[in-house]
């Protein structure tokens, strides 16, 4: 049960972090007139990835395997976005 609450907190905090990153990047986009879409892709992938890496020691074996699979998917998404 503790693990479920930990994941719920992670999802909640990462949502707020990504939402704040979207607002800041939109404001910078309007202020400077530049496109920040590569930065957005990086932030939208990096913030949840850091949270998943930090939560990995507290998860069970099945959840850890799923978490590693999600991290691999995020790495592939970053590679495809910036190649």
Swiss-Prot record:
Source superkingdom = Archaea
Where does the sequence pass through the membrane?
Answer: 7-26, 36-58, 65-82
Predominant location category: membrane
Give membrane topology per the record.
Answer: Multi-pass membrane protein
The compartments listed are: Cell membrane
Q: Which keywords appear in this protein's UniProt record, sorted alphabetically? A: Cell membrane, Membrane, Transmembrane, Transmembrane helix
The GO cellular component terms are: plasma membrane
- What is the protein named? Uncharacterized protein AF_1524
Q: What taxonomic classification does the UniProt entry list for its organism? A: Archaea, Methanobacteriati, Methanobacteriota, Archaeoglobi, Archaeoglobales
């Amino acid at each position: 049960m503790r693990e479920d609450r930990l994941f719920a907190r992670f999802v909640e905090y990462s949502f707020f972090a990504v939402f704040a990153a979207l607002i800041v990047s939109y404001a910078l986009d309007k202020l400077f007139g530049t496109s920040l879409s590569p930065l957005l892709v990086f932030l939208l992938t990096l913030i949840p990835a850091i949270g998943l890496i930090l939560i990995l020691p507290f998860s069970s074996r099945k959840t850890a395997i799923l978490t590693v699979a999600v991290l691999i998917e995020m790495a592939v998404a970053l590679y495809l976005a910036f190649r």
